[in-house]
Amino acid sequence: EGTFYNSWGYFLSAEKMINDRHSISLATYGAPTKRSQSAAVTQEVYDFRGIYYNPYWGYQNGEKRSSRVVNSFDPTVVANWDFKITDKQNLKTGFGFHYSNYSNTALGFYNAADPRPDYYRNLPSYQINDVLGSYGLEDQQNHMDMIMSNVDQDLVDELTGQWVNNNTDVTQINWNSLYQSNYLNNVANPDGSAKYVLEERHNDLMTTALNSVYSNQINRRL
């Protein structure tokens, strides 16, 4: 759910025979790609929403928007020069250039509620586990009915209903709520930082290579 994949590729190659002794060739290729990601979730969430559930997206102005988008582009250029020195001597020289541009986005938050819809505190089970966690194992074994009476069952039922009925304001990222939180925070504290940010992490790499191979047939055997 909420995923997309856009990619295309190209390959161009050309060779020029300058004369009987020299030739040059050039090749370039790449595959610009933009795609969204999905995530593994807990069994509780799978039970509510099924195996295709993906917590990384939500609606913004009626359109699906993913918080995890990968952009990748790895253009490569290879050039070769073939020099026939004599009938027995040859020099081949090659140059390669490769640039890897890889980035992926993710939500960040500061002094604010976790925006992930499947964060454990946002699930119905947390309302039960939070109460159980305040009692020891012996109390849980001997006084379970008393302990469970302290659980806000109405809240558990409400959250369960929202997940089962797929209230996307709860089950997916609530983009409008994030923007509203940032807006209100900016009104109250104009010099402060945003509560929520969409960061883009880059891992870029540039590589060049140069090699030259000389061959010479000394005699019929070498």
For the regions a language model picked out, list residue spans one by one.
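Transmembrane beta-barrel strands of outer-membrane/channel proteins
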Residues: 1, 10, 26-32, 95-97
